[in-house]
Amino acid sequence: MNIPELFGCNVFNDVVMRSTLPKDVYKSLRKTIDNGERIDMSIADSVANAMKDWATSKGATHYTHWFQPLTNLTAEKHDSFIEPVGNDEVIMQLTGKSLIVGEPDASSFPSGGSRETFAARGYTAWDPTSPAFVKEGTLYIPTIFVSYTGETLDKKAPLLKSMTAIDRATKRILKLFGIECAKVNTTVGPEQEYFLVDKKLYEQRKDLVLTGRTLFGAPSCKGQEMDDHYFGALKPRVADFMRDLDETLWKYGVLSKSKHNEAAPAQHELAPIFSTMNVAVDSNQLTMDVMKKVALRHDMVCLLHEKPFAGVNGSGKHNNWSLSTTGLNLLDPGPHPESNTLFMLVLACIIKAVDKYQGLLRACIASAGNDHRLGGGEAPPAILSVYLGDELGAIVDSIVMGKDYVPKRAIKGSIGVPESPIFPIDSTDRNRTSPFAFTGNKFEFRMLGSSQNIALPNTVLNTAVAESFRQFADVLENAKNFDTALAKLIKETFKNHKRILFDGNGYSDDWQKEAAARGLANLPTSVDAYKTFMSEKNVELFSSLGVMSETEMRSREEIYFENYAKIINIEALTMIEMVSRDIVPAVSAYTRDLADAAEI
């Protein structure tokens, strides 16, 4: 297997575009992708025809506008390429209009009351910055989804708007440092956890089939108490699944990188390489879909529920978030972070954003499934805090106290074996209990549930940080002395938001008390978190940056509450049915058998 040749073979990527599009069309499309410029409608027919020719050469007969409604899933309607030309003949055709705009029925998707049941018209619009791909005989075209009246009905449109907001705000900051760039990219790498169970055993469990988790059961004699499953040797059946999964994902251009056993029995993880945010969101949705289908090929079922089994760890999805432009990662502190004023400014903006919007960040990852994980001694607590590590924490302290930072001498590590290499020791340890941790050149948002679409958490992060950047730029652009104003702004921000910084054990009861003393939000359940979503400052945040209107936010709040209630109701009905049809009859039969045996 030649992996470089295999990778992206089913994707209408840059290599394919360069070879199939006229030069001027290719250049125009690249400007849209690379610089965020509006698509030139005059190139639509040319791009559509090239896509169709390429897709049909891959065996595709249909195309679909692939979008992400306000569920955690994707949606698709398949239309064939055939067009009648008379004399009972057809041709294969994809027009520019069909590429750019679709018109699915919007009445049956969640709208949170923003649309009447009879109001059916909705539109899908092509996202040219995320590549199309061929899967199972269909050309998948990534799109956004809006209503006839213009409200967004999906998770991707607000994400793209938030990417625009943070791009514009960050460029203002960079310009103050003499850095000109065409575009600032937000990048993400979501670490996907999941369980694998035998298909025959799965089908015997009504609760697993209907709810994704076991509602009744006894603890296993052996769980994860021996700590021997994490990073353990892969069992042949699991290894075959992972090999098949990697190859399938690589064909779709998904940067699947790491795979390993997780802490709980039958639990595993897949981690990709970072990619541009909207592409990463699409890739993660595709990954979850492919996981389920590949598992079935191996007579297994992939469980993405956050807590499929009581008594062992549940599954999350660490969201590795960063900001970069050409040749520059804005979250790379460099060898001397204390003198890297751009990095310290970016760090201050992020800390301010997390502190100010604790409730919103908690709400954006809330779900009925995730409630079983958060604060349970296996996942981050439900209280937001930021972990910076020893070095950055000490630098922040020195800035707040107005003292010079004295860096520690670099330490080289050795395990004492002559043959082993000498290796550098990182400047900080890792804190696995932190919900929002700095890990070298990125922030790791660890509160997401495994089944969650990562669009909303990243929309919130982008928007909150963009507001901080915009506010900082307003101050610095009007400063008489830039360096003095910059130093003052960084110091004041660290001082005002230092309460959100925590490097201790997030699982401890002491942290609950300390967090309350600091005035941090403690929202233990999803319902508690959802109640904060429509706060005045949250509405102002999204509306002022053009990411979501108050109407769009209110519809989402309605959907969150409704979805939560429906999940709990389904679980309750499933429990009632299992008790009445399975458990009680089984107990009755068993007691009858015992009684008959006693008579004998």
Regions found by a protein language model. Give the residues of each.
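C-terminal accessory/binding modules appended to enzymatic or scaffolding proteins
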Residues: K27, D34, I39, I43, ...
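Substrate-recognition/cap regions that form aromatic- and gly/pro-loop-enriched pockets
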Residues: F561-I600
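Active-site-proximal loop/turn and secondary-structure-junction residues that shape catalytic pockets
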Residues: I43-V47, F67-P69, K97-S98, F145, ...
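Short linear, low-complexity motifs centered on an aromatic residue
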Residues: N72-D88, A106-S107, R205, G212-T214, ...
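Glycine-rich, acidic/polar active-site loops that bind/position phosphate-bearing ligands
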Residues: A120-L304, N313-N319, L323-F561
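Short alpha-helical basic/polar micro-motif
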Residues: N49, T61, Q285, D289, ...
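Regulatory N- and C-terminal appendages and interdomain linkers associated
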Residues: M1-N2
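Active-site core of metal-dependent hydrolases
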Residues: L6-A119
